[in-house]
A protein has these predicted regions:
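Gly/Ser/Thr-rich phosphate-binding loop
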Residues: 7, 11, 34-38, 46-121, ...
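Conserved ATP-binding loop and adjacent catalytic segment of the adenylate-forming AMP-binding
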Residues: 15-18, 86-139, 148-152, 161-165, ...
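Alpha-helix/helix-capping structural signal
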Residues: 22, 41-44, 82-83, 148, ...
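Conserved ATP-binding/catalytic segment of the ANL
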Residues: 129, 136, 143-198, 203
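AMP-binding/adenylate-forming catalytic core of the ANL superfamily
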Residues: 146, 178-257
């Protein structure tokens, strides 16, 4: 709400709120927005609809078609609420549409990091840390301090004490998210509650594994737990394709499970 509602109201911009993803594209044609604020699911939906057509002429005209889908006037697209999958991000980037991705929580009012359009950006990250926000990674968890951190939950001291901790004369908010910081950029690895321990003693995050698999597997897949020889179900159109995916995933997942 801070980004899409309050910011635009302060600057007296015209604001339209979509009534649902089913009518999102039709609404874009009618409203012709200059800026879009969306969740990743909307961008995934647009990508899937275009790829479903799978016609050479459409692929040739993709940059123009994408702009038309969003009403024809879109200059900026902001994505938030969840991590944008790398294949989706790359799809739009390849077609001259840059997605600005940010990260934050309601408890931090809300921004913690953002990938700006103009400044140096790292598209694999969830953005560069804001100047007035302090972020530390404690036991793998993203923790935040600064003037944007809430005072607490209304009339719920127990819940407040569970997420706010005092350290170095500052109040830190425990996000419950796993991440790391490199060169001032924040990288999201998933929810800490999605971490589980393998039989070899190593920890792995389900969301991070899903992200790697989804880069190379277009069909639905399931990660359903740890077994002696297998813990995921992936469908492919041929044995050759399966063997190709297995080789790629073995290399990629070894970088994630460490």
């Amino acid at each position: 709400q801070t980004c899409e509602l309050y910011y635009n109201l302060i600057y007296d911009n015209k604001l339209a709120i979509s009534t649902g993803k089913e009518v999102f594209m039709q609404e874009c044609k009618e409203i012709k927005p200059d800026v879009l604020y969306v969740v990743p699911k909307v961008l995934e939906m647009v990508k899937q609809k275009i790829e479903f057509l799978d016609k050479p002429l459409i692929k040739l005209l993709l940059p123009r078609l994408l702009k038309k889908i969003f009403g024809g006037n879109v200059q900026y697209i902001f994505s938030g609420g969840a991590k944008l999958k790398e294949p989706v991000k790359q799809f739009f980037s390849d077609n001259n549409i840059v997605i600005c991705e940010g990260y934050g929580c309601s408890e931090t009012a809300p921004m913690i990091s953002v990938n700006h359009f103009e400044s140096p950006r790292d598209t694999e990250s969830i953005g560069k840390l804001l100047d007035n926000v302090l972020v530390e990674i404690i036991d793998g968890e993203i923790q935040v301090a600064g003037p944007n951190v809430m005072l607490g939950y209304w009339e719920d001291k127990e819940k407040t004490n569970a997420v706010l901790v005092k350290r170095d004369d500052k109040v830190w908010y425990k996000t419950g998210d796993s991440g790391e910081i490199k060169d001032g950029f924040l990288y999201y690895k998933g929810r800490l509650s999605d971490n589980y321990k393998l039989s070899n003693g190593k920890f792995v995050n389900v969301q991070e594994v899903e992200g790697v698999i989804s880069e190379f597997v277009q069909a639905p897949f399931i990660i359903y737990g740890e077994h002696d020889s297998h813990n995921a179900l992936i469908t492919t159109e041929s044995i050759d394709k399966l063997n190709e995916i297995k080789i790629i995933l073995q290399e990629k997942l070894n970088l994630v499970i460490k």
